[in-house]
Structures are given as structure tokens and as C-alpha cells.
Amino acid sequence: MLSKTIAAAVQGIDATMVTIETTLDWGNQVVIVGLPDTAVKESSERVRCAINEAGFQYPNKTVVVNMSPADIKKEGAAYDLPIAIGTLASDEVVKPDLLSRYMIMGELSLDGSVRSIKGALPMAILARELKLEGFILPKANASEAAIVNNLKVYGVDHISQVVKFLNGEVELEATVVDTRAEFAQAQGNFPYDFSEVKGQDNVKRAFEVACAGGHNIMLIGSPGSGKSMMAKRLPSILPPLSLSEALETTKIHSVAGSLKSGTTLLTTRPYRSPHHTISPVALVGGGTYPSPGEISLAHNGVLFLDELPEFNRTVLEVMRQPLEDRQITISRAKYTTNYPASFMLVASMNPCPCGYYGHPSKPCVCTAYQRQHYLSKISGPLLDRIDLQIEVQPVNFDELANRTPGESSEAIRRRVVQARAIQSLRFKDSPGIHSNAQMTTSMVHQYAEPDAEGLELLRNAIERMNMSARAYDRILKVARTIADLEGSISVRSQHIMEAIGYRTLDRSNYFG
């Protein structure tokens, strides 16, 4: 008897329908066709043991499994459960009546228990688009899949539950999540707040400007000056995630398998801080079977690269294009995968190898050449893509001893949200553009053209600092953001002056 089970394959952050056809023939082997990977081919032994351990009889015949369409690579052990159910249906142990109404996915242990899978959320979205009645999957993934409306999600722990449900012997309890209620309730829960930061008013201001316009920022300062501490507080002043952003962010983490069991919706912006020993594949994504890298896991959030010059030069260079395109394309021989990568880059570095150049009390032992060589580990094109470069000085004793709390993250966030609202209105007719940092060159000329005094100020700065054309655009974008924070319609000279002040590494005398 031929049975058909509905499953799914994840491509990028979306899912594609896979039909698993199972039939029995003479002999005693298992044949799986349809471009399966090694894990899928190995499922035959897991399925055999799981069926027998669950109290059913594995058919003493050749089991032929066809996974269509055949041109899509089937990866991972998530096909164990649908293959097992298809096998039992072909052997007339499971009634086939309900198989066309449910998507079934799950990895099987040898005892028949069902283990978690990757990509449950995009699969659930596909099941709804296919107008299926429900989605049967591991209980550990039920919460993330249940955020999809108009779809019944059934989390199971054991294959026997699925068999009894499909045979009409038991009713499974659907997992229900009130997505909007959970999204609203979880907003604004941050472990760190800028009110805890002593001093550093100029750095706080730079962070406010960066968040208001979605700009990348570099912090240059000695060890212990508070670079990492302040970077951790950055998500607390970014605008809240919209529901659509939260869904997209959760999809990426679902595909990567980084969601904790029981997680429904990611409601705060991601903050990723990879170690400087990270490989290019781990940073941008890829591998034999592509999966999202750190830049995609930071989508709609913050990617913090601490001690930037310590990263391998190759690692940093592969990040240049995603910074511009806000997505990463991974090409393989037979297919291409795209992952979103619209993140805010926050980088930090010491000013020199010893770390104390410019320190008010500790002498630097590096030569000017050593300082220049240290910076040269970061390419010019990458530095050009960082809009704000701010020097972080150590906090003095009086500021440390001051018990008066600083301005709260909530107060800063309100100004950031107001500036972003101005930008949303400005770019309402420009698809894919949401903030000043994303403006094209023509948009910069249209929306960020300074007044005559500001233009002359910018001309002098460009000529003296020998800046690139990209740096010119960056200054105007930052100046536009500063004007938005003030509620100013036009970009004036004081906005240009402040924006130029955030180009620390462009100063010719910075390294002595």
C-alpha cells in the first residue's frame, strides 16, 4: 500500500513542502531516494528500532521511501517521524485518512521518543500557507510553532502518541500561544541600563545618535574604560521590535536551532558577541549544509565585535559586503541560500598594542609605527563602513564615586524612537529603507544636504582629513540623524560639526 506523508525542507529562512511516499515491496531492505543526506539515509535504523521499541512490528519487507521534489536536498534527522509514520501506514498499522491534513516532523530516538528539530517556525508558516489542519512535531518545538495563527500545533513526546492520534484512539492537546499578548508583555525587559553608567556623557550621546539612525559605531579606548560594559546596554535604547521584525528574528533563530525549549517569540533585539577566534563560516554563515552565521543571528539587533584588530583579517573582510547589502548570499553547486543580515555593528579596540595610548595616567610604550600597524589590521573599506568612531576615556574617581544615577535607558530610548518615527515617515515610499544609515547616495543628496555654512565646514574637513567619498556620505547620514534628534527639518552647521567629531580615526594626528 502506498502512503503519502507531508513534511518540509528549510531553505534559507523559509520552508518548502516535501512529500514522503512510502511503499512496501518484496525483500528485506530500506531504500530512500530523493536527494537525502547522510543523516536521512541513516534514519532507516533509527526508524526500525523506534517502531519495534514502541510496541509495533517493523514490516519484514523492503521499505521504499521517495522524498519529492527530488531536486531539493533533504537534510537532518527531522524526517525520522514522517518516514516512520509512512512506513506504518504502508503496513496498514496507521490509518491513512488524516495523513493529507497534517504536516509531521521530528527526530526519533531508538526508544521511540521524539526529539527537537531545527526550523519549526518556518515549517509551521508553510503548513498554514498550505491550508493544512495542523502540524505534529516534537513537544520541545511546539511553543515556537504555535505563534503561527490559524494552525493547530500538536507537540508529542513519543511516536505512539502520533499513531494513536491518527488512528482516532486519542485526542492530542493543541499548544496555544497568544502571540500579541506575549509580545506586548515581554517588551522592555532589559538586564542592563544606562543609568548605571558613570560619566561617559560623550559616548552615551554617540550611542544615542547611532541607535537613532541605525549607524555602525566603533569604540576606541584603553582596557577598563567601559567599552564592553556600555555596548551591552545598547539594546536597551534601540527602538522596540515590531511584531513582523520579531517573527523574522525568531525564524532565523529557529532555523539555526538556537531557540531554547519552550521559547515562543523573541521580543528583544538580539545581541551577539562572538569571540575573536571565530571562523569566517561561523561569522557569516555557510558550511556544507548552510546555516545562519552570527551576522544573521544578529539581524534586527546588535553585533558586538570586541577587540576588532584581534579578529582574523579574512573574517573581517567577508563581512564587508553584508554590511552594505544587509543580507548574505551563500552559493553552492546546485542552489543558493539567502539569509537576512541587517544588524547594527558595534566594534571596540584598544588604541595601540599596549592599550594605553592617550591614557591620562598610564604611559604608552608603543611607537607611532606600531600604532599605525595595529590599526592597519582593519582595512580602510571596512573602517569606511563604520559611521561613528568615538574615543572612550577612562572615568575619573569623582565620577566613579558619584552616587547620582545617570539618565535612564528609557529616557534615551524615547528620543531614539521619536527620531526613528521621523525617518519612517521620510522613507514610507522607499521599500527596504527604514533608517538614515540605509540611505542611498541619491537619498543623501535629497534629505541630508547641509546649509551653506555646513557645506563649507564639511569641505574643509574632507580636504584636511583626506576622507573617501564613502566617508563623506557617512558624515551626512550621521548629521541627518542628529538633526532628526533635534527635530530639525534641515541639516545645519552644528549637526555637521558634531558628525565630523565622530570620525576619530580620520584625524591625521591621532596616532602621533
Specify the residue positions occupied by each region the protein language model found.
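Peripheral, non-AAA+ core regions of ATP-driven protein-machinery
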Residues: 1-218, 222-228, 331, 471-472, ...
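Basic, amphipathic alpha-helical bundle interface domains used for macromolecular binding and assembly
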Residues: 33, 39-44, 59, 66-76, ...
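Residues immediately C-terminal
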Residues: 110, 303-304, 310-311
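P-loop NTPase nucleotide-binding/switch module
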Residues: 170-209, 213, 240-295
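Walker A/P-loop
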Residues: 219-260, 325
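The Walker A (P-loop) glycine that initiates the GxxxxGKT/S ATP-binding motif of P-loop NTPases
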Residues: 221, 285, 307
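Walker B catalytic acidic pair
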Residues: 300, 306-307, 318
